[in-house]
Regions:
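Helix-breaking motifs and short loop linkers at transmembrane-helix boundaries and internal kinks
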Residues: 48, 80, 101-107, 118, ...
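Conserved MFS/SLC helix-loop-helix module at the cytosolic interface between two early adjacent transmembrane helices
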Residues: 67-106
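Helix-to-loop junctions at the C-terminal end of transmembrane segments
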Residues: 69-80, 266-279, 369
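Primarily marks hydrophobic transmembrane alpha-helices of the MFS/SLC 12-helix fold
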Residues: 85, 108, 282-285
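Paired small-residue
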Residues: 91, 95-98, 106-115, 307-315
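Helix-loop-helix hairpin linking two adjacent transmembrane segments in secondary transporters
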Residues: 105-107, 135-193, 235-242, 247
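Cytoplasmic helix-loop-helix junction between adjacent transmembrane helices
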Residues: 111-149
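A late C-terminal transmembrane helix in Major Facilitator Superfamily
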Residues: 334-372
C-alpha cells in the first residue's frame, strides 16, 4: 500500500485541523441520526403518514445500528483505513440525499437504514485515527470530543435542523446535511492521514475479542449504564411537562439545558478517563453510578418540589455520559495489548453497547410507564445503575499495577 503525502498529522495543539474534522464528522453523524425526532411531525405531514409510523424510524435505526457496527468495523479492518473511511462517508452522503428525495415512506426507511448501517463503523474508524492526529497525552480528550460531537448535534444540530424544516420544509434539512457532508468529505481527503495497517487476521478471528473477560464486563457495564439513563430519558419531555410542570412552550428550552448538561458529561468523562489505563478508568466510575442511582430514586418525588426536580434532571444529564471515554479506553487498551488484530472491532464496542442499552432502557421504560406511571421510571433506572456499579467492582482484579 502506498502512503500519500499526509501520513501523520500530530501536533502539540489538540485542536488541529484533522482533529476538528473528526469531531465535525461525529457531529454530522449525530445530527443525521437525531434530527428525525425534531422534524417528525413535518415528515408525517409531508408523506401523509402517522407520526407513530415515522417514530418507528428511530427504533429501526438503532436496531440496524447495533449489529452492523461490530460487523462493519471488523470488515473495515481488512482494508486501507483512509479509503474505507471515505467510501463509508460516501454511503452516508447517499443515504441523506435519498432521504431528501424520498417520495414515500418505504424509500425513506431504506435511506435511514442505509445511514444506520455505516454510522457506527464510521465512529469506530474515527477512534483509530487518535494515534495519528494527536499525541498520547490528548488521547482521552480526543475520545471525549469525538463522543461530544453527538451531544453538540443534540444541542445545536437538531434545533437548527428543526428550524430549517419548519421554515423551508423537512427535505431541505436533509439537503443541508448532505451539503455539509460533502464539504466534510473534501476536507477529509485533504488532511486526514493515509497510513494504516490492515488487519492480518481473518474476519471471524477478530471476534475472539469477545471471549476476553475484560471486554465482556466492559460491554455489560455500558449496556447497564445506558439502560439506567434511557429508562427515564426516553420520556424526558413528559417528565418535564407532567412531573415537574414545565409549560409546553418552554419544553424546548428545557431540552437544550439538558443537552448542555450532557455535553459537559461527555467532556468531563474524558478527564476521568485520564486516571489510568486499561480497565482502571472504568472502575473509578463506580461511585458515579451510585450517585446516579440515588438521583434516579429521588426522581420519583420530583412532582413534590418541581424546582428540585428540575435540578435533579440537570444532575442526571451531567452523569449520563461520564463512562463513555473510560469504557472506550478499556476496549482500545485491551485490544492493543491482547488482540492487536481487533482494534477496529474494539473501537466499535462503545457504540454497539450503548445502543443495546438504549434499546433495553427504552423498552423497560415503556413497560414501566404503561404499568406504573412516570414516577416509577427513575427507581427502575436506578436498578440498572446499581448493576453497572457492581460490574465495575468485578473489573478491579484486572487492574495492572
Amino acid at each position: 500500500m502506498t502512503n500519500a503525502p499526509v501520513t501523520n498529522a500530530r501536533t502539540d495543539r489538540f485542536f488541529n485541523f484533522p482533529v476538528t474534522i473528526l469531531i465535525f464528522a461525529s457531529f454530522m453523524l449525530g445530527m443525521s441520526e437525531f434530527v428525525v425526532v425534531g422534524i417528525l411531525p413535518d415528515i408525517a405531514s409531508g408523506l401523509k403518514i402517522s407520526e407513530v409510523t415515522v417514530g418507528n424510524l428511530v427504533a429501526l435505526f438503532a436496531f440496524v445500528y447495533a449489529p452492523c457496527t461490530p460487523i462493519g468495523s471488523a470488515l473495515s479492518a481488512r482494508f486501507p483505513r483512509f479509503a474505507t473511511y471515505l467510501i463509508l462517508m460516501g454511503v452516508f452522503l447517499v443515504g441523506n440525499v435519498l432521504c431528501a428525495l424520498a417520495p414515500n415512506y418505504p424509500v425513506l426507511l431504506i435511506a435511514r437504514l442505509l445511514i444506520a448501517s455505516v454510522s457506527g463503523t464510521l465512529v469506530a474508524i474515527s477512534m483509530t485515527f487518535a494515534p495519528d492526529v494527536t499525541t498520547d497525552k490528548y488521547r482521552t480528550k480526543f475520545i471525549a470530543w469525538v463522543f461530544s460531537g453527538f451531544s453538540i448535534a443534540s444541542v445545536v444540530g437538531v434545533p437548527i435542523g428543526t428550524w430549517v424544516a419548519n421554515t423551508f420544509g423537512w427535505r431541505v434539512t436533509f439537503y443541508l446535511v448532505s451539503v455539509l457532508t460533502t464539504v466534510l468529505m473534501i476536507s477529509m481527503a485533504l488532511v486526514l492521514p493515509r497510513n494504516s495497517h490492515p488487519a492480518k487476521i481473518g474476519f471471524l478471528r477478530q471476534f475472539r475479542l469477545f471471549f476476553d473477560r475484560r471486554i465482556q464486563l466492559g460491554v455489560l457495564d455500558v449496556v447497564c449504564g445506558a439502560a439506567a439513563s434511557y429508562v427515564f430519558y426516553t420520556y424526558l419531555s413528559p417528565i418535564m411537562r407532567d412531573e415537574i410542570g414545565v409549560p409546553e412552550q418552554y419544553l424546548s428550552i428545557g431540552l437544550v439545558i439538558y443537552g448542555c448538561a450532557c455535553l459537559w458529561s461527555n467532556l468531563y468523562g474524558g478527564k476521568l478517563a485520564d486516571k489510568g489505563r486499561g480497565v482502571e478508568p472504568l472502575t473509578h466510575i463506580r461511585p458515579i453510578y451510585c450517585v446516579q442511582a440515588v438521583c434516579l430514586c429521588l426522581l420519583a418525588f420530583a412532582s413534590l418540589v418541581p424546582a428540585a426536580g428540575a435540578l435533579l434532571l440537570v444532575a442526571l444529564g451531567m452523569l449520563m455520559y461520564l463512562q463513555n471515554s473510560a469504557s472506550q479506553v478499556l476496549y482500545m487498551d485491551v485490544a492493543y495489548q491482547s488482540h492487536p488484530g481487533s482494534v477496529n472491532l474494539a473501537a466499535s464496542l462503545n457504540s454497539m453497547s450503548f445502543n443495546i442499552g438504549i434499546a433495553i432502557g427504552s423498552a423497560v421504560g415503556g413497560l414501566v410507564n404503561d404499568l406504573l406511571g412516570l414516577a416509577w421510571l427513575g427507581p427502575v433506572g436506578a436498578i440498572f445503575a446499581l448493576f453497572a456499579a457492581g460490574i465495575t467492582t468485578l473489573l478491579r482484579p484486572y487492574i495492572q499495577r
